[in-house]
C-alpha cells in the first residue's frame, strides 16, 4: 500500500475482521413475481432508442395496428357487443355447444360427456374441439353469453395478423418482413376464393371459428418453435401453444404436426434433436386428454363421404393451388418462389422451412384425396388454407429480398442502419398502400370511387379530374367482397331477423308441448322438415337450437356435429322421407323424399315423439297418416305426435349376432344398419354386433343384385345392402312391461316387470355407456343399444373408459414434464445455427436479435448487433446485419474517425465474441433463472 494510503481508509478496516454478516432475507414471492412482470417492459423502455429502432417500431405499430384495426372494422364491434344470439350458417347452431358445456358438463366436473340434444345422443366434445368452447364459458363469467360467444368467435381472425408478425419476429426475419407478414395474414383473411375450408373471414362466419383460433395458436407456436430451435429457450411455452392449437381444431392438428416436424428436421443437430423431441413429447401429452380419445373412438363417428377435389371436368389441382386471378397468382407465387430460393441460398432456415412446408402441403392435398388412411374423415381441400397463408407470408420474404438485392446492386458501400431502416419502412408502407387500395376496391369502399358504365359494362372506377386511373368490372356473380356483410348478418343475431317473431312463437309452442301434463305429450325428440325457408330465421339450422331454448326438453333430431354420432345417417334418411325436398348431406345413402308411409315407421324406430312440417306437400302426407296426430300449429308449421315411438321398448324376438366382416368397420356397420333400417321386413330379428352366447350367430353378404357402384366415392355409388346368408331362427320372447322411465343428461333408468328379456334402448351406441342391473349394453342396428336385465331396476350411465383415464393421465404427465423441463433449464445449443462451424463459447451471448434488448448485444468489435437487417452469407439466418447508427454509440465501443462516419460494419454472427458474459442484475440472481443449463 502506498505511504499514507491507510490514512484514507475507514477506521473500521484497521480493526480485526468480524464475523460474516448474515445473508439478507430473500424477497417474498409476490415481490419476485412483481419484478418479473415489470422487468421486460422496463428493460424495453430503458434500452437506447436509435433512429433505426424508432423507425422499426413505428412501422410495426402502423402496419400491425392497421391490420388489427381493419379486422375490428370488418367484425362490426358495435354488433359484437350487442346482447343478442349470433346466427348465420353453422354459427347459429354452435350457440348450443358452449352453453351445454357450461350448464351440464362443467357443473359435473367434466369438459367432455354425453348429450341427448341431437341425433339420439352423442358424445359431447369428444370429437369436437373443446378449447374454444371453454374460452366462451370463461368469458361468459363477465359478459352476457351472446357477447362472449361473438368475442371468442372473432378472436382468431382479429389476432392472426399479430400472430403472423410475432412469427416473423420470433423467427428473426429481417425488418420489415415481420411487419409485412401481418399484411400477409390480412390478405389471407380477406381471400374469398373459399368459404368453408377454414381460417379466412367467410369460413369463420360460416361457423369455422375454432379453426381460425387454432390457426392463430399454430402460427404463434411455430414462431416459438423457431426461436427455441435457435436458442434452446421457450420449450414449455412452445409445447403449451402448439397443444392449444391441436386442441382447438383437428384439421389444424394435422398442420401443426406436419409443419413442426419439418421445422425440426430443417434445424436438426444433436441438441436440437433433444429440444424438438422433449418439446414434442410434452405437447402431445398435454393434448392427449382430447386427441387420444378421438383417435381411439373414431370408428363410432359418421363419415359424411364428402368426396375430394378435384371434382368434375372444370376442377383441377392447378385451380386448387392457384385460387386467385391469374395476375395475382403470378405476383404472389412469383415473389414466394423468390423468397424460398433466396432463403435456401442464404441458409435462412425458417424461410426455407416455409417453402418446404408449402410443397409438403401440396403433396398432402394430393395424397389425401381419398381421405386419411385408417381414420378417413378428411376432405382434402381443408389443407389448402395453410398453403395459402404460408405462400402469402413467403411472398413478403421475396419482396424484401428483392428490394435488398436491388439496393446492393446500385450501391457501392454497405448501407447504414438508418438507411436500411428507411428503405425497410418505405417498402413496408408501399406494400401496405398497394394492399389497402386493392382491398378498398375489393370491398367497394375506395374513397372517391364511383359506379359507372364503360363500353356497355358496369364498372367501379377511381380517378382524378375525370380520368379513371383504376377501373374494375362490376358485373358477374360476385360484385364486391362480402366479409363485412357476412359478419354484420351473423352478429345482428336471431333477434335481428325479420322473422324472429315467427321463430320465437314456434319455439314457445314446442316448449308448451314439452310442459304439457298429458302423458302422451311432454318432453321428447322432434324431427323438423328440412326446407330453405328456415333461413329466414337467421340460418337453415335455426331449429337445431330447440333443446337450447327449451332446456333440453325438446331434443332436435338434427344437430350440427354431423360426424360425432353414428346415428346421423339414419336421421337424414328419416328426414328425407318427411320433407318435400331434403338436403341429404350424407352421400351414398338411398334416400326417399316426401313419403310419410316410409318416414313414419322410421320415426317410430328412432323414438321420435314430434314431427314438424312446413310445406304443403309434407303436410298433406302427414295428414294422410293414422299414426300421426296433429297436436299444435304455429305460423306455417304443423306439429304432429308420432304414435308408438317410445325410447325404451322390450323386444319380442331375440336378436341375432352378425359375424364381423373385413374392411372399413365404419362402412360395415353402416351397411348393416341401413339394410335393417330401410328393409326391416327382410330381417326376422334385430341384428347385433355382439350378445350373449344363446343369441344366434349369422353371416351376412352383399346383395349383388342391388349393388350400385363399387369404388368408394365413385359418382352415383350407393351403400351396399346386406342380407342374412342363412335363415334366422325366430326365438319369440315373453312380453314384459317397461315402467318408471327416466332420462337424465348422462343417465337412463327404467324398471322391467321380468328379468332376462332383452330391452331396446333407442339411444346412440357408444362404448362409454355402462349398465347396472343388466348385461350389456350391446350394439344393435341401426346404432342403438340392447341390455338384458338381471334386475327389475336398470340404471345406465355414461362414464370415462379406461383408455380415457389413461389419456387424462398422459396429460398430467405432460404437466409434470413441463415442471421437469423448467427445473432442468433451457437446452444449450453448441451454435446459434446448425450449419455454423465455430462453436459458441460460454462467454458468447447466443441471443443477438432485437427481440431481447437493443443495447445488450454486440459483435466482436463492440458494435451493437441488430438482427433486423440484411447481412451477407455465409449463414444468413433471416437476414442479419450489424448496423452502426450515428445516434447511438456504446461507451464500451470506441469509434475512430473512419467508423464515426455513417458506415456500417457487418458482423459475422458466428465469430466468437470477446465481450464479457451478460451481467446478472440482483433481480435476476434472486429469481434463479440463469443457472447453467443442462443438455436437456
Name each model feature, range by range.
Residues 618-645:
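Short acidic, glycine/proline-enriched helix-loop-strand junctions
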Residues 255-256, 294, 535-538, 618-623, ...:
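Extracytoplasmic/secreted cell-surface and envelope-processing proteins
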Residues 49, 702-854, 935:
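Active-site-proximal, structured, solvent-exposed surfaces of multi-pass membrane proteins
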Residues 242, 434-497, 501, 511-602, ...:
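Extracytoplasmic/lumenal acceptor-recognition loop(s) of multi-pass membrane glycoenzymes
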Residues 256, 527-529, 614, 643:
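Generic beta-strand/beta-sheet core signal
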Residues 905-907, 911-936:
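Intrinsically disordered, compositionally biased tail regions
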Residues 2, 6-494, 505, 512-517, ...:
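Membrane-embedded transmembrane-helix bundle of lipid-linked glycan/lipid transferases
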Residues 190, 250, 532-536, 611, ...:
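Solvent-exposed loop/turn segments at secondary-structure junctions
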